[in-house]
């Protein structure tokens, strides 16, 4: 097994890898924050069944959850600049890291949308009725009562999602 796995090379390369840990952490943190925010908005739109947006987000979520991450990365990195060039926009000089942030954010948004949708559905209907009986608007009831409980319930699956994303970077 000596010619397939060289421990001395691994020990030599490890300090070089440590120089880039901050990039991995930065990609993970920024994409997780933006992805969960976008996913929460998508979840609310899906729950409210906004006519056109609901169908678009169903397709978006199915695509993002059903295709391998590497395929998504290739499609965004090579496809978006090509499409934009036909529209007269030159995206050839955009740094590759921008596309990495975009793909990770969209990927996390798709998964977190389903997590948040199920978490919001899990909040007891009586909580929503109580907020309405107190005279709260729908926005107030979401911000003050429903979303805090939903976020509490979604912490374990969101943590798993972020850990998986960290490993994926």
What do the predicted segments below correspond to?
Residues 1-169:
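Transmembrane alpha-helices and adjacent helix-loop boundaries
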């Amino acid at each position: 097994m000596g010619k397939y796995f060289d421990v001395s090379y691994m020990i030599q390369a490890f300090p070089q890898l440590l120089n880039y840990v901050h990039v991995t952490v930065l990609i993970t943190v920024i994409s997780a924050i933006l992805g969960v925010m976008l996913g929460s908005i998508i979840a609310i739109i899906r729950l409210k069944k906004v006519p056109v947006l609901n169908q678009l987000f169903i397709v978006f979520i199915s695509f993002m959850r059903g295709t391998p991450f590497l395929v998504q990365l290739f499609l965004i990195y090579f496809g978006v600049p090509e499409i934009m060039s036909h529209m007269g926009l030159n995206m050839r000089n955009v740094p590759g890291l921008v596309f990495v942030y975009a793909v990770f954010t969209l990927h996390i948004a798709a998964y977190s949308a389903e997590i948040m949708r199920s978490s919001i559905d899990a909040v007891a209907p009586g909580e929503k009725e109580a907020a309405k009986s107190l005279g709260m608007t729908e926005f107030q009831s979401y911000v003050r009562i429903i979303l805090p409980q939903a976020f509490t319930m979604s912490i374990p699956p969101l943590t798993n999602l972020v850990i998986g994303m960290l490993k994926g970077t």
